[in-house]
Curated annotation (Swiss-Prot):
Function: Acts by interacting with multiple viral and host proteins to enhance the activity of viral RNA-dependent RNA polymerase.
Source organism of this protein record: Hepatitis E virus genotype 1 (isolate Human/Pakistan/Sar-55)
Further remarks about this protein from its record: This ORF is only found in HEV genotype 1.
Induction: Endoplasmic reticulum stress conditions initiate the internal translation of ORF4 driven by an internal ribosome entry site-like (IRESl) element.
Name of the protein in its database record: Protein ORF4
Length: 158
């Protein structure tokens, strides 16, 4: 479906120096950009919690691919590779903290009110938000003409 497509998220680019890439810096809370593709994370069901997977969906403004569909591959030294069929897995393309900008204003279905810790390459992956969402999760659906705030997720892998 979407497998093999190349999607470039400007939020994920990092400056280069002669000493190598500069570690990415977590973005502050902000409004969603309708000009960028969006990667959405949906809460996994309890049956998925022990597994090293997330339920993922991927969307462009105005459309949404529901969980279980093939996710796009983001293939670059500075980007993530998202893989799906039936309970998506996520693999990190470089072994250092890396932010993923998650914005669900155009996704159908429930919002990612809970970000699940999981394991990638047998190492703990810790997801955190910069306070974009209230404890009860974001308002869903978004108010007419409104956008949900971005949640910057930082993933730690060895």
């Amino acid at each position: 479906m979407l497998r093999g497509q190349q999607i470039w998220l400007s939020n994920l680019t990092q400056p280069q120096t002669s000493a190598g890439p500069v570690p990415a810096v977590e973005s502050p809370p902000a409004l969603c950009s309708t000009s960028l593709p969006q990667v959405c994370l949906d809460p996994a069901s309890p049956a998925l919690l022990p597994k090293p997977t997330w339920t993922l969906s991927w969307s462009r403004p105005g459309s949404c691919v529901m969980p279980g569909a093939a996710a796009a591959s983001l293939l670059s030294p500075r980007t993530l590779r998202l893989e799906s069929p039936r309970g998506a897995g996520l693999s990190l393309m470089r072994p250092r903290p890396f932010p993923l900008i998650c914005c669900c204003s155009t996704c159908s279905g429930p919002p990612p009110s809970t970000f699940l810790a999981t394991r990638i390459r047998s190492q703990p992956s810790i997801l955190s938000t910069p306070g974009s969402f209230p404890p009860s999760g974001p308002i869903w659906p978004p108010p007419p003409g409104g956008m949900l705030p971005i949640a910057a997720l930082r993933m730690y892998v060895s």
